[in-house]
Amino acid sequence: MDTEGSSEQGKQTKEQVCSSLWPEGYPAAETVTSSVDMNTQPYRNLSGVRVGRPKLSLQGVQRGRPHSRRRHRTTFSPAQLEQLESAFGRNQYPDIWARESLAQDTGLSEARIQVWFQNRRAKQRKQERSLLQPLAHLSPATFSGFLPEPPSCPYSYPTPPPPMTCFPHPYNRALPSQPSTGSSFARPYQSEDWYPNLHPTPAGHLACPPPPPMLPLSLEPPKSWN
C-alpha cells in the first residue's frame, strides 16, 4: 500500500512540474510533433492575421535542388571516323537509307550518325567562314598587286611589204600565126582574155602577165605502124 501511494504522489508531482513549464493553452510536449505534421488548420498570430501553418515535406527539398543532367558523349574509333568521313565526302546530306546502311557498317546507331553529320556540317561551315574572314578585310588595292601590268606601248602590227614590181614575161610576145586546118585547131587566147577586170596599176609598176598559153594539140588520129 505504501508503494502505491508513493507512485501516485510521484505522478502528481510530475504533472505539476509539466504544467508549470508549459503555460495554459499550449499542448503537451508529447503532442507537439504530431501537431506539426498533421494539424494544418490556420491559426492567428498576435497581429490577428490568419496565416496558414507551413508544411514540411521532402519533396519540396528535392525540388529545390537542380538536377545535374549529364551528357553522354560517344567515342568513335579511327575506323569508324574513316568510314564517316568518306561517306561525308560523297554526300553531306545522307537520307535515312544511307544512314541505316552506314550504321550497319560502323556498328553505331542511326541517331548517332545523324548527329555526327549535323556536327560535321556545322564544323565545315565554320571553317569556310574562318577562311573567308581574312579576305573580307583586304582592300581592292591589295589585289591589284597580283594582276599583270598592262603593256606600256600599244601593240604594233607589221607594215605591209611594198608591191612587187613585175617585169614583162619573155613569152608575152605574139605567137607566130599557124596555118589553120579547119576546126581541128583551137584559137589561142589573147592576154586580154585572162584578166578582164584588173584595176589600173600605178605608174612605174607593170601588171604581171598571164602564163604562156598552151599550144593546141592536134586532133588527127594516130598513125598505125605496120
Curated annotation (Swiss-Prot):
Biased-composition ranges, Polar residues, are 175-184
Q: Which InterPro entries match?
A: HD, Homeobox_CS, Homeodomain-like_sf, HTH_motif, PROP1
Q: Does the keyword Membrane apply?
A: no
An example Gene Ontology CC term for this record: nucleus
Q: Where in the cell is it found?
A: Nucleus
Q: Which SUPFAM superfamilies match?
A: Homeodomain-like (SSF46689)
The residues that make up the annotated DNA-binding region are 69-128
Q: What is its main location?
A: nucleus
Q: Name one GO molecular function term.
A: RNA polymerase II cis-regulatory region sequence-specific DNA binding
Family annotation (Pfam families): Homeodomain
Residue spans of biased composition, Basic residues class? 64-74
On tissue specificity, the annotation reads: Exclusively expressed in the developing pituitary gland.
Q: Which PROSITE patterns does this UniProt record tie to the protein?
A: HOMEOBOX_1 (PS00027), HOMEOBOX_2 (PS50071)
Q: Which residue stretches belong to region Disordered?
A: 44-74, 172-226
Q: Name one GO biological process term.
A: regulation of transcription by RNA polymerase II
Sorted keywords for this record are: DNA-binding, Homeobox, Nucleus
The answer on whether this UniProt entry bears the keyword DNA-binding reads yes
Low complexity bias spans:
216-226
Function according to Swiss-Prot or TrEMBL = Possibly involved in the ontogenesis of pituitary gonadotropes, as well as somatotropes, lactotropes and caudomedial thyrotropes.
Q: What's the family?
A: Belongs to the paired homeobox family.
* The name this protein goes by in its record: Homeobox protein prophet of Pit-1
Recite the lineage of the species. Answer: Eukaryota, Metazoa, Chordata, Craniata, Vertebrata
Quote the gene name from the UniProt entry.
PROP1
